[in-house]
Amino acid sequence: MDTDSTHVRLSAIGIVAVSLFLALFMRLWFLQGIDRQAFEAASVSNRVRVIHEEGPRGRILDRNGKILVDSETSIVVSLDREPLRKMEEPERNAVFVSLADTLQQLGVPTKLSLIEKRYADLRYAPQEYVPIADDVDPSVEIYLMERADRYPGIIVERKAIRSYPYGNLAAHLLGYVGEINEKELVERGGQLPGSENSSTTAPTTTAPTTTAPSTSPGSSSGADSGTRLTDYRLGDSIGKGGVERSYEADLRAVPGERTIEVNAKGDLVDVLSLKSPVVGDDIWLTIDIDLQAHAERLLAAKIQDLRGGRDKDNNRLNAPQGSVVIEDPQNGQILAMASYPDYDPSVTVNGISQEQWEAFNDPNSGLPLVNWALQGTYAPGSTFKLYTALAGYNSGYLRDGTEVVNDPGVYTIENCKGEKCEVRNAGSTPHGTVNMASALTVSSDVYFYKLADKFWNLTDQYGETPIQDAAAQFGLGAKTGVPLSGENPGRLPTPASRKAAFEARPDLFMTGDWRSGDNINTSIGQGDVLATPLQIVNSYATFANGGTRYQPQIVTKVTRPNDLTLPANDPANYKLIRQVEPVVQGTIQIQPDQYAKIYDGLLGVTQSALGTASASWQASKTAWPMAGKTGTAQVSKKADTSLFAAWGPAGTGEPARYAISVVVPESGFGGEVAAPLAFRIMEPLSFGTLLPACLSADQSACAAAADAASAASGNDVTSGSAD
């Protein structure tokens, strides 16, 4: 019995032992065979990295090839979190403390909390380098490289950043770049860290460029653009505004890729493969930087001079912002676009601090990031009379423009019942007998009041919107199509839009009805009418060329450089990728004799002794006559908005070469502020005596020379007529 029991127990032990050995054998066979590839892949993943390399963005040039935005090398200190994660927390913290202290001593203000925050930042993929200090001095790079063993997990590399040779000039037009955010990344087909489609093989790291970029002069634009638009990583730069944003697909470099082998500490062992980035294409703007600098300088000086003054009604002249736009009437090219206040785009290069961002968006600072030339909307005042004049002819109410009106300075609205049945000229000034031409020259509101009143009382004959229809032909009430983000369409009110607005928000309107008073206000650019300075200049450029409305353009061509060390404007040094051709948006039909009547009236604004801008033009005469219209728009409880729109040459038989609009809110009469400023800007342009724009390094001396030249010309006057 005992023998049998012992035998059974030994048999059981044997079976268990064999089972254990069999399980161990099967596990070894599985590890060496079936799962070998997975372990090999994991091993490769731990020692091989594919590094995503951004290349230098393309340059932005003015129409003559002067470099306005370039790329330069910046030294960046970053964290390599892979080796840092393998450390014990006390050891890792010691590295962070030492690094923060060292950077502080080397003149790079860096808080320990920033390093800790960046280390834990989930926006970056696990293997991505995380920047903690940008644009450091080369001495910092040397110091850290010589002591690499004391700073494990800390790398120093180089990347391309934007530089601005002309400083703040054209900042609103050029725009700025910033780090791509998650929304932008997803929109462009990029992948967020940890997403399902992220690679599970060799990790991809975003790193600064360390190799010379290829210009690939023979590659096609189409082949490059797909890569440029989709191969983004968090940490990459992207255009955030202006030309940088609108032409991102051209400016962005085709990213490169570097496959490297590292050891357990993260140190470089070998470069396994290298694909250099392809530098972005160059964008040639339509603007002339010399003219841009001239316009910006005079605009800023005028606004600063106005502030703190008082108008005739004792309203404070705050002049919170202003803009100047100059356009070529023959093709729609924008030659200058000045917006004040401006900003320094270089502060955005390494990211905008919260403090700086709040300052940019503080209304008390004038909102310097806003491009007031295309985002600001203002009542156009009497500059709107051009469209009302055209409506008079288009409707058939006016035949040849010789019809006269007696202007006693006040007009009584027909069929009006109530207290507010009288409307007046500025200052109730009487102008006597006026026709179309003279009404424009002296800015007779009464003439246009009567025209608008007749339209509304005879809607069965002229319809409800003859004035709005004429203004729409000039592009008001719609975006111009300029290839810049953020453009405001303005507002062109109609009886239908008033009714819809009332139904949507009855608390904001007394009634949804459109009345004669609304028509009258609209006829002189008041009431609910709003326009941008860009819309105004484009409409006057349209009239100046005879009626062809062009889409405003800001780019002439896109090129690919052969050699970045050679002059950018040498045709032998670049390949043309595409030329930007003029785009016709519409044509205004008007009889030659009717066109001539309006033309003569606008020419008289500057050339007639009675013109509202004649005194200003006499003080700052251009090489040829100019025609245009002053505007003074009333704003409740504020000083008036000053406007002027004009073109030249005018009245000489030559094609118009330049159209200009000037808008300065809360500054006073158009004939006293905007018109004199416009002539001062146009004077050296017309004579060919524009001074070269100052490079950023020469700003002080160059600006002093420009001020001296301006003072020598003796044209610092602001006198003029009321409107």
Residue ranges and their predicted role:
Residues 144, 279-303, 698-700, 707-723:
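N-terminal leader/targeting segments and the immediately adjacent pre-domain N-terminus
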Residues 69, 262-274, 287, 322-325, ...:
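Beta-lactam-recognizing serine transpeptidase/beta-lactamase-like catalytic domain environment
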Residues 89-90, 237, 286, 668-672:
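Ordered, soluble secondary-structure elements with a strong preference for glycine-centered loop motifs
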